[in-house]
């Protein structure tokens, strides 16, 4: 009695095709993820460097305004002519705001480092964007009011009979104007970190 055997033909192309397709899909996914991670890491490093520059600019702006005291060489028996940042609440607000901004940027550096270590994490980037926007509103309010007072100190106001004082207090006006100018540099530096994140969000 003969043994009967059954043969099943399995196409060789099907298994090889499936084996060939699987690695290709995996390689494509890994390549896309690595490319996106590298792009985000580069933006995070750029953001970190800009924050360091913003710390320097904000600190120098606050220090320049804080040391803007000037006393005129002449005085009377009852009066001494002196000008300082603490004589004007607007300049006090500027110094306090710049100090708070410097402290905030220092505290935001660890979050910026997290975005470098984990470039694909969206939560730290979103948190920085929200906080940066709030701080930008504070700094804009402080600088715009300080710039307005500095303009009046330089040019005066004929309608209200406010006389310009910069002809007498030259050093005081130079330092206050320098503080406002440094703020413009700090604003530009501090505004840029949010731009890469917004452009990245628009792409998605």
Swiss-Prot record:
Extracellular side: 63-92, 147-204
Taxonomic source organism: Raphanus sativus
NCBIfam families named in the record: A_tha_TIGR01569
Membrane topology reported for the UniProt record: Multi-pass membrane protein
Protein name: Casparian strip membrane protein 3
Compartments it resides in: Cell membrane
Task performed by this protein: Regulates membrane-cell wall junctions and localized cell wall deposition. Required for establishment of the Casparian strip membrane domain (CSD) and the subsequent formation of Casparian strips, a cell wall modification of the root endodermis that determines an apoplastic barrier between the intraorganismal apoplasm and the extraorganismal apoplasm and prevents lateral diffusion.
InterPro entries for this protein: CASP/CASPL, CASP_dom, CASPL
Single GO BP term: cell wall organization
Subunit-level organization: Homodimer and heterodimers.
Record has Transmembrane as a keyword: yes
Assigned protein family: Belongs to the Casparian strip membrane proteins (CASP) family.
Taxonomy, superkingdom: Eukaryota
Keyword set, alphabetical order: Cell membrane, Cell wall biogenesis/degradation, Membrane, Transmembrane, Transmembrane helix
A single GO cellular-component term on record: plasma membrane
Family matches, as Pfam families: CASP_dom
Spans within the Cytoplasmic topological domain: 1-41, 114-125
Presence of keyword Nucleotide-binding: no
Chief location category: membrane
Transmembrane intervals: 42-62, 93-113, 126-146
């Amino acid at each position: 009695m003969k043994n009967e055997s059954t043969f099943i033909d399995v196409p060789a192309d099907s298994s090889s095709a499936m084996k060939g397709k699987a690695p290709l899909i995996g390689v494509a996914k890994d390549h896309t993820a690595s490319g996106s991670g590298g792009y985000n890491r580069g933006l995070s490093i750029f953001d970190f460097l800009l924050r360091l520059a913003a710390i320097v600019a904000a600190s120098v702006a606050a220090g320049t305004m804080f040391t803007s005291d000037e006393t005129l060489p002449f005085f009377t028996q009852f009066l001494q002519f002196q000008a300082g940042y603490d004589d004007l609440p607007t300049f006090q607000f500027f110094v306090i705001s710049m100090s708070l901004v410097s402290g905030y940027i220092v505290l935001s550096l660890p979050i910026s480092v997290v975005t470098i270590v984990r470039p694909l994490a969206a939560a730290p980037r979103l948190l920085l964007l929200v906080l940066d926007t709030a701080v930008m509103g504070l700094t804009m309010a402080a600088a715009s009011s300080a710039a307005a007072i500095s303009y009046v100190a330089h040019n005066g106001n004929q309608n209200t009979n406010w006389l310009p004082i910069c002809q007498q207090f030259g050093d005081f006006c130079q330092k206050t104007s320098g503080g406002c100018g440094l703020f413009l540099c700090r604003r530009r530096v501090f505004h840029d970190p949010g731009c890469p994140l917004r452009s990245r969000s628009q792409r998605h």
